[in-house]
Design a protein with these regions (language model features):
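N-terminal phosphate-binding caps/lids of nucleotide- and nucleic-acid-binding domains
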Residues: 1-170
Length: 170
């Protein structure tokens, strides 16, 4: 649980170095990024997610009605049997939100078998008044004022990026 939390924080902040030890064993060591933050974020995601993520990911960057979505989505050929490599952030905060995970699943529905999951890291920035982060004590769940807008933004951005990368729905 601690390792997962540190990984999520490290993804959100590539400009910060992270190190985690378990006794004498180095569990995680990530240097701080320099230069372009888009490249830095992709390098950080690749270091954490493995599976040659950077070589098999497409950039996501779009906005709609005050919402801004960025990040990287794995190509359909890069997938897993569980959703453990799906990372979602709202205003820089790691979240585990059913609406967001459902939007990702919906976007990949025509590209992946039902039991497969995309590797993804998405960063959604919304105006503070458009989201309630006090739904859960750990603040890992959120409630959006316009959940349809959020879902539509994610689904359309992912489908558009996958199509632009040459992937067509089956």
């Amino acid at each position: 649980h601690v390792l997962d939390t540190v990984r999520r924080l490290a993804m959100a902040h590539p400009e910060i170095a992270f190190s985690l030890r378990d006794g004498e064993r180095q569990v995680l060591k990530l240097s701080h990024a320099q230069g372009d933050m888009i490249d830095a974020r992709l390098d950080r995601l690749d270091a954490i997610m493995g599976n040659n993520f950077a070589a098999n990911a497409i950039p996501i960057e779009t906005d709609r009605d005050g919402l801004f979505l960025s990040g990287f989505a794995g190509l359909p050929t890069l997938n897993r049997g569980n959703a453990s490599h799906q990372y979602l952030f709202v205003n820089g905060r790691p979240v585990r939100d059913k609406l967001l995970y459902g939007a990702v699943r919906g976007a990949y529905r025509d590209f992946l078998a039902h039991d497969r999951h995309a590797l993804i890291a998405l960063f959604l920035d919304v105006p503070p008044e458009a989201v309630d982060i006090n739904v859960h004590p750990a603040k890992t769940e959120v409630r959006f004022r316009d959940s349809g807008l959020v879902r539509g933004l994610i689904v359309s951005a992912l489908k558009h990026a996958l199509a632009a990368a040459g992937h067509r729905a089956s």
